[in-house]
């Protein structure tokens, strides 16, 4: 699997999972983070709207297997807890390293939509804070903190 910045999990180049977060913070303190995970488990191709069928996938479609949702949840939460404790010990650089290793956005042509508009460019790197750095055709490098980023081609292509 691979991660598409900032919050999509891809399997075989198709979205199988999305992760959303809500954060309450002050300048030097995070009050709380709420994490929502949407995972396509048993959908069949016909369960997706026609416009998503080429871009979406379920675990069952990818593997042909049936998954017990409670067991999936247990494994996800155990892995989440493992990463959380590693973060507490090692800090955000550890998270950033894992994110970079699994990322399929970097080096790819992307279409970016933010509250300030839309543009195309090349995804260069994740900043130390986790922002996506994108080079526009003009050469300007833009730091994306939030927005919709779409890969312009299949991420398996070179």
Residue map of PLM features:
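General beta-strand structural signal in soluble alpha/beta enzymes
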Residues: 1-5
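Conserved active-site carboxylates
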Residues: 8
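Long, positively charged amphipathic alpha-helical accessory segments at protein N-termini or as interdomain linkers
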Residues: 11-158
